[in-house]
């Protein structure tokens, strides 16, 4: 039986085309394309597997779960560089946010969702959230 709060994430399930743009770490005008699949692991977690083609394939995985005791969603992140991170997550109506506040730097993801599209932006802060710089825009379009 799915947790009622996790069931609210059902709209993320499916196959998505991805577009990454306006990334500070790429040449101006560069646009990347990829895809993501979101599916349930049992009835307890969501798994997002994403891939982008750049000079070589770039992959990452998110596992989304929930703590009933503190009423929070959590995202575990891992990518093909071996990077592992933990984000807090909220889904409030059509706004999807993820936030990481770690000693090395902070990151945030803010997206607006509709049934077939998610427009999101990621930012980073190297001064504990006092100032933020844009990382990139990412768009999900349901296949």
Model-based region annotation:
Residues 1-15:
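N-terminal helix-cap/turn-to-beta initiation motif at the start of protein domains
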Residues 13-17, 42-49, 70-75, 91-99, ...:
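Short, hydrophobic/aromatic-rich segments at coil-to-beta transitions
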Residues 15-46:
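Short, solvent-exposed loop/hinge segments that bridge or flank secondary-structure elements
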Residues 16, 28-30, 73, 129-134:
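Tryptophan-centered short beta-strand motifs
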Residues 31-35, 57-61, 82-86, 104-108, ...:
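Short, surface-exposed coil-to-beta transition loops
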Residues 51-86:
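Helix-adjacent hinge/juxtasegments
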Residues 112-116:
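Beta-rich strand-turn-strand
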Residues 123-126:
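Conserved Ser/Thr-centered positions that define the repeating blades of beta-propeller domains
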């Amino acid at each position: 039986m799915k947790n009622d709060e996790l069931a609210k994430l059902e709209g993320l399930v499916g196959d998505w085309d991805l577009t990454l743009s306006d990334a500070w770490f790429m040449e101006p005008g560069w646009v990347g394309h990829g895809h993501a699949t979101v599916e349930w692991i049992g009835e307890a977690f969501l798994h997002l597997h994403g891939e982008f083609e750049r000079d070589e394939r770039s992959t990452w995985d998110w596992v989304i779960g929930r703590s009933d005791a503190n009423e929070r969603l959590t995202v575990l992140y891992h990518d093909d560089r071996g990077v592992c991170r933990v984000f807090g997550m909220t889904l409030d109506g059509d706004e999807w946010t993820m936030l990481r506040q770690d000693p090395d730097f902070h990151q945030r993801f803010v997206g607006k969702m509709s049934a077939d599209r998610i427009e999101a932006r990621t930012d980073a802060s190297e001064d504990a959230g006092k100032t933020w710089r844009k990382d990139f825009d990412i768009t999900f379009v349901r296949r």
